[in-house]
């Protein structure tokens, strides 16, 4: 309650800084001055006038700051000197601070009782060395039930106990936030979990599974790599299946890299017989995966770009910038023996393996085994393939480090002869590529000019094509004709004989001169 001050008591003078620094006090002073009341002589006024002023001005002032008007406790507990100077919490910026202090714990209390849990995918991003397994959705996000089964599959890696653990985890609430990367088990395992006793339910879940096909990469120590894939193999002979699944330890070790992962390399296949276009050109693609992994083949979109932005390139899905490739066109699969498979997932334009279509349009295909050197085509040319975005994708498949060329004795001897030739011509025993400044090693494509200088072919290719057939050496500036005709073998033999005869004549002349010099000296 407000306590009036006697008239004979002098009113204290408010500090100048308090009136100038406080914007609310200044506005309050302007309000009182406009009504004919001096704020310094406010104490000399009647109590009724003093009560009327807060009743009319405080409510409007508090509304400007969005403060509730039921803060009577704060205003009643203010000190007398604060009420006199116009700096009470009810009419100054102090009310905002006190209100925030009173209300902040109430707003933050639920957050403290329900802390945010970091998803498993975020733990992968924070980890310096990227860990496996990972899973990416290239299409629509998954549901909460799907994430519950996925989280358990990541922890257990046991297909038989998935249903029991899932029932135990159902009462607990889960986070509905969908992340771009969620660790999970293969989609085929999810099909068995969700499917009921009747076969129709399983078929419907299978259709939904391939509609939201996921990109799965497992580590090298993934158990049951072949079982979790649920392969649907075509009918083959017993001998072929025996050779496929019975791999000795030496062959299996050769198929793996130093981290125990299998690999696949895709290079563009240039069809010389095609008269219209050569297909979509792309840089060689190398992907690595552990047993039981599933690599999605699809179209490059913004969603895919955001999903793979924090994943190493060797674990990316196989995506192309072509309209004839569906968003989830198909997938590669690899089992525990290092065997690779291709599956068409209801693509509209089709998947062709060695010029044979795997399945009709909008239908699933079998898990067809792949062999080293197979030709794979995704889609068909649209509008004649005049635009690059409407061209099909043709590629050659190389499996399990088969493209790695090992330097044998012949390669090393060839490089040694090249270095000896450079030593004779330039006096330098070992010359690096003058374009990229890297060493020339065995099993590399090398271009040797007639002046005995050499470069990597990919480095000098543009210089060769720029003024072909004339070539100007960038090192010594000598010019040569790359289309110059070769001499016949007979002429070469005759030139060799003539050169050998000339050498004999020169040697004899030198011997005769030396003998004359010896005879002349007594």
Swiss-Prot record:
Domain FHA, by residue range, is 295-358
Region annotation Disordered: residue ranges? 1-56, 69-92
Q: What is its EC number?
A: 2.3.2.27
Choose any GO biological process term that the UniProt entry carries and state it.
Answer: protein ubiquitination
What happens when you mutate residue 165 to T? In strain: YJM 267
Q: Where are the zinc fingers (RING-type)?
A: 433-477
- Tell me which domain of life the UniProt entry assigns to the organism this sequence originates from: Eukaryota
Q: Which residues carry this modification: Phosphoserine?
A: 206
Molecular function, one GO term:
ubiquitin-protein transferase activity
* Glycyl lysine isopeptide (Lys-Gly) (interchain with G-Cter in ubiquitin), cross-linked positions: 211, 256, 258, 288, 310, 333, 343, 346, 366, 406, 412, 423
UniProtKB keywords: Cell cycle, Cell division, Cytoplasm, Isopeptide bond, Metal-binding, Mitosis, Phosphoprotein, Transferase, Ubl conjugation, Ubl conjugation pathway, Zinc, Zinc-finger
Query: What top-level class of enzyme does the UniProt entry assign?
Result: transferase
- UniProt-annotated location(s): Cytoplasm
Q: Name one GO cellular component term.
A: cellular bud neck split septin rings
**Which Pfam family is an annotated match for this chain, by its short name?**
FHA
Q: Which PROSITE patterns match?
A: FHA_DOMAIN (PS50006), ZF_RING_2 (PS50089)
Main localisation: cytoplasm
Q: Any extra remark in the record?
A: Present with 1750 molecules/cell in log phase SD medium.
Could you identify this protein by its name? E3 ubiquitin-protein ligase DMA2
Species, as recorded = Saccharomyces cerevisiae (strain ATCC 204508 / S288c)
């Amino acid at each position: 309650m407000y306590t009036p001050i006697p008239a004979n008591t002098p009113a204290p003078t408010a500090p100048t800084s308090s009136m100038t620094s406080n914007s609310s006090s200044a506005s309050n002073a302007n309000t009182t001055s406009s009504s004919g009341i001096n704020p310094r002589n406010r104490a000399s006024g009647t109590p009724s006038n003093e009560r009327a002023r807060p009743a009319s001005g405080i409510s409007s002032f508090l509304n400007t700051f969005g403060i509730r008007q039921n803060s009577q406790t704060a205003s009643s507990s203010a000190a007398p000197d604060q009420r006199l100077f116009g700096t009470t919490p009810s009419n100054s910026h102090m009310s905002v601070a006190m209100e925030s202090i009173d209300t902040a714990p109430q707003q933050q209390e639920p957050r403290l009782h329900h802390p945010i849990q970091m998803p498993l995918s975020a733990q992968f991003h924070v980890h310096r060395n990227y860990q496996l397994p990972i899973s990416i959705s290239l299409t629509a996000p998954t549901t909460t039930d799907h994430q519950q089964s996925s989280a358990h599959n990541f922890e257990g890696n046991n297909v038989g106990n998935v249903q029991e653990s899932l029932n135990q985890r159902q009462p607990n609430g889960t986070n509905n936030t969908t992340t771009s990367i969620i660790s999970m088990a293969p989609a085929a395992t999810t099909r068995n979990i969700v499917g009921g006793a009747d076969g129709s339910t399983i078929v419907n879940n299978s259709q939904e599974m391939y509609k939201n096909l996921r990109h799965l990469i497992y580590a090298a120590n993934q158990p049951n790599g072949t079982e979790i894939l649920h392969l649907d193999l075509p009918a083959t002979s017993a001998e072929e299946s025996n050779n496929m699944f019975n791999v000795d330890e030496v062959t299996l070790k050769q198929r793996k890299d130093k981290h125990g992962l299998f690999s696949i390399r895709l290079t563009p296949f240039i069809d010389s017989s095609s008269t219209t276009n050569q297909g979509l050109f792309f840089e060689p693609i190398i992907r690595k995966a552990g047993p039981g992994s599933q690599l999605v083949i699809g179209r490059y979109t913004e969603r895919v770009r955001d999903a793979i932005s924090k994943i190493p390139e060797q674990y990316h899905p196989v995506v192309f910038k072509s309209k004839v490739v569906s968003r989830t066109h198909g997938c590669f699969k690899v089992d525990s023996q290092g065997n690779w498979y291709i599956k068409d997932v209801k693509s509209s334009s089709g998947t062709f393996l060695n010029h044979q279509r795997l399945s009709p349009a909008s239908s699933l295909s079998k898990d067809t085994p792949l062999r080293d050197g197979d030709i794979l085509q995704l889609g068909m040319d649209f509008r004649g393939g005049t635009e690059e975005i409407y061209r099909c994708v043709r590629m050659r498949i190389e499996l399990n480090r088969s493209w790695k060329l090992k330097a044998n004795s012949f390669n090393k001897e060839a490089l040694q002869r090249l270095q000896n030739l450079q030593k004779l011509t330039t006096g330098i025993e070992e010359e690096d590529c003058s374009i990229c400044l890297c060493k020339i090693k065995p099993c590399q494509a090398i271009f040797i000019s007639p002046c005995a200088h050499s470069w990597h072919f990919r480095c000098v290719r543009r210089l060769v094509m720029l003024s072909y057939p004339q070539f100007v050496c960038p090192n010594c500036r000598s010019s040569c004709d790359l289309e110059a005709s070769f001499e016949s073998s007979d002429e070469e033999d005759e030139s060799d004989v003539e050169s050998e005869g000339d050498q004999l004549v020169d040697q004899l002349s030198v011997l005769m001169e030396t003998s004359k010099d010896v005879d002349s000296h007594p």
